[in-house]
Amino acid sequence: MRHYTGIDQLINSFDQALRSLVPGATAAQRQNPAETVEAKLGVEDARHVAGLMRVNHSGEVCAQALYHGQALTAKLPNVRREMQQAAIEEQDHLAWCEDRLKELNSHTSLLNPIWYGLSYGMGALAGIAGDKYSLGFVAETERQVSLHLQDHLNQLPAQDERSRKILEQMNEDELHHRHTALEAGGVELPYAVKITMTAISKLMTKTSYYL
């Protein structure tokens, strides 16, 4: 088994960041859930949906960064593998959201590099704190992401089945990741940590909708 040096890990981290931040750099491994449905939207509806999907894309950028940061500092090999596998599955979400934004003639958030950097640091710190807290961080993150997705599903125009199919599959995956993290030994995070996570999430949501 190959031993990765600090330089190897640094190069890998840089590669992961580029794949998460550069449009078109990530390809989905699973079929896009929206491929079998159509959606015709008016100008205002399309603009609103683009804002929602931009927020969801930024959320997936954050998820990638969290998992990458946690995988870097996780102590147990099985936990590290869990983080790496979750990141791979989240890549599908990243690609699906980006595809939908292209269909809507819109763009990903200009603030994504900031969200990636913040989330990567938070993930690495969670890993340093210990695997049970790292897994707890995953569980809480996925819980909050699921709440956002459910809210966005309620905001979608009734005729937008393409976005709906994508968000429904994403929500199913997020809940599965949360369950897996808890089953692996994740613990509930301190209240102050959860409040901080919520505040950062709200800031990301409000800004990425427009930028």
From Swiss-Prot:
Chain positions recorded as Fe cation 2 binding sites: 90, 142, 174, 177
GO molecular function, one term: 3-demethoxyubiquinol 3-hydroxylase activity
Catalytic activity: a 5-methoxy-2-methyl-3-(all-trans-polyprenyl)benzene-1,4-diol + AH2 + O2 = a 3-demethylubiquinol + A + H2O
The keyword S-adenosyl-L-methionine is annotated on this UniProt entry: no
Protein localization: Cell membrane
Top-level taxon of origin: Bacteria
Keywords: Cell membrane, Iron, Membrane, Metal-binding, Monooxygenase, Oxidoreductase, Ubiquinone biosynthesis
UniProt pathway: Cofactor biosynthesis; ubiquinone biosynthesis
InterPro entries found in the cross-reference section: COQ7_proteobact, Ferritin-like, Ferritin-like_SF, Ubq_synth_Coq7
Stored Pfam families: COQ7 (PF03232)
Essential cofactor(s): Fe cation
Location, primary (coarse class): membrane
Cofactor binding notes: Binds 2 iron ions per subunit.
Binding locations of Fe cation 1: 60, 90, 93, 174
Task of the protein: Catalyzes the hydroxylation of 2-nonaprenyl-3-methyl-6-methoxy-1,4-benzoquinol during ubiquinone biosynthesis.
Family recorded in the similarity comment: Belongs to the COQ7 family.
Protein name: 3-demethoxyubiquinol 3-hydroxylase
